[in-house]
Amino acid sequence: MPFYCSPTALQRLYHPAGERAVAAAAEKFGTMFGVSSLGTVSIKELRKHKNPQVYQFYFHKDRGLNRAMLEEAKEAGVEVLMLTVDSITGGNRERDLRSGFSIPFSLTLGGIIQFAIKPLWGFNYLTHAKFCLPQLDDHVDMSDGALSIGRYLTEMLDPSMNWRDVEDMVKFWDGQFCLKGIMSVEDAKKAVDIGCSGIILSNHGGRQLDGSRSPFDQLAEIVDAVGDKIDIIMDSGVQRGTHVIKALSLGAKAVGGGRYYLFPLAAAGQRGVERALGLMKAEIIRGMRLMGCNSVNDLSKKNLKFRQR
């Protein structure tokens, strides 16, 4: 299936099974699954699944931390590294600021009220494995207080990251390496020059720079520029099988989604994710049949007609 589960953080916040449920559902559909640096299940455990996986990584100020985390990923058997380049500082997550969200959890008055209204939340929290961040536990000391995701992105990540840093990481990894968050032809060409094997056109679902251009609007020009030199994937805002078909028609090799499977995960765990992936697969197949296409190889720009602006 040309749709995959993009890496998302903190999946056990949505359901106790978290990444375990998503990985199992993706394996059932034979599609790719992304594991986040801020994941709540270890990459070592998730590697037992046979479907393709990528490890999404953030670039830290501490170069020793970067190297140590990459070494652990290699030892776990990770084959594809995905470096996120559009989140070198935290976005303005106003809801998180209002709620006081942090890791480990710190109860606020609002949180206590929510737990009282929904006692099953508290029961699940107390009866399931402790919430943690396995990819960071050995490297980040959170014993002195709560760490918000915004603080992690702003204080620990390196806003001075440059192309030389990325090139050094590509060489150190010495395997399949992709950049997530590419949004221009110039950057796509640079990714090719330094030896990346793939790029993901993404604006982080609009959660970082809310006024950024849609990745779909960038897709055609980037495919025209480097599509024959590097694998191009797209995510952000994908909700329908016809969205996937349009992106594939413009030259994307695959399309990812995050919130698309997170809400079903929250509602029904693995069954919910399987239901979402099943609906997506059915929509893609139905749309292609109605277009007279038997294979994704039949899709091309000829299938699309853009509005004149």
Residue ranges and their predicted role:
Residues 4, 82, 178-179, 200, ...:
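Structured core elements
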Residues 24-29, 48, 193-194, 223-226, ...:
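Alpha-helix C-terminal capping segments
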Residues 32, 79, 197, 253, ...:
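Short acidic/polar active-site loop segments enriched in Thr and Asp
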Residues 52-58, 198-203, 254-258:
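Short hydrophobic/aromatic-enriched beta-strand-loop microsegments
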